[in-house]
Regions:
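A structural boundary/capping signal
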Residues: 1-279
Length: 279
């Protein structure tokens, strides 16, 4: 490690590749070294090495998650760990469980689908005071599950992923769909496909949910949106998205927060993680 500050780029490249290959076990030593050095350029080299080690491990975990058809919660936690590598996952899991339990206590089998969603909205947005913020790429925290829960603020994607996780845990058939320029959720009719295999995908949707606020929309509202956008409402837009596609969309949108000269490498890394989730 004494060669980390070597001015010869070839020497530094060779040393850095070796250190990164050692994995996360090398991180404590790098952190200790950082504290003993006053040279800012060398400190930045160490910080980048630590980041590269985290990214290498995270890439491996994403591949494992994809290959094992992991759940949405774990995918969202992996995405958050890109920006917060020391994320304490148990804190997030405990918070999600509290919201799930309080919601479950208010649900019953006698409720209609809209009444069920009203219960979820009441607990998530009113009792827990979750707020929706407009889509912006100035603050990555609004995309990430840990910070969205901690600050009670999330954009449509940040809030939407938590909403999907809660519905999955509560056995409510709410899924993300791929409406252009929107992150919209849909309450699905689980019995539809068995009887209507050749119909338009929108026919399996009872109604739509805006994850920013929990507001529900009817089919005519979505039809009006497509008309306004001058886009044909193709059947593919209404198919439920797999967990991999939801996290892929999260990573792609999150990457736009780093579209500047200083952080452009982060944008590239997030897009490479997204590409790993391709079918």
């Amino acid at each position: 490690m004494r060669l980390i500050d070597d001015p010869d780029e070839y020497v530094y490249h060779t040393v850095s590749e070796k250190l990164v290959s050692l994995g996360k076990e090398i991180i404590p030593s790098l952190e200790n070294l950082w504290e003993t050095i006053s040279n800012e350029e060398t400190q930045e080299r160490i910080e980048m090495l630590i980041h590269r080690v985290h990214f290498r491990d995270l890439s491996t975990e994403f591949i494992h998650w994809k290959n094992n058809k992991g759940n949405l919660m774990q995918g969202a936690l992996l995405a958050a760990r890109y920006h917060y590598p020391d994320l304490e996952e148990n804190i997030v899991l405990q918070e999600i469980e509290k919201i799930r339990r309080n919601t479950w206590l208010e649900l019953s089998s006698y409720l209609t689908p809209m009444e069920q969603v009203n219960v979820v909205n009441s607990i998530f947005f009113n009792y827990y005071k979750q707020k929706g913020v407009e889509m912006s790429y100035d603050n990555p925290d609004h995309f990430l599950i840990n910070k969205t829960l901690e600050t009670h603020k999330g954009n449509a994607i940040g809030n939407g992923i938590i909403y999907l996780i809660l519905c999955e845990l509560l056995d409510l058939p709410v899924k993300a769909i791929h409406i252009p320029r929107q992150f919209i959720l849909a309450y699905m009719d689980n019995e539809y496909e068995a009887f209507n295999q050749k119909g338009h995908s929108s026919e399996q949707i009872k109604f739509y949910i805006d994850a920013l606020s929990g507001q529900m929309y009817a089919h005519k509202d979505i039809e009006a949106y497509f008309k306004k956008m001058s886009v044909h409402p193709a059947s593919s837009y209404f198919r439920p998205q797999k967990n991999e596609k939801v996290i892929q969309f999260l990573l792609e949108e999150l990457s736009k927060c780093f579209d500047n000269d200083r952080n452009n490498y982060k944008m590239d890394e997030l897009l490479s993680l997204s590409a790993m989730l391709d079918d």
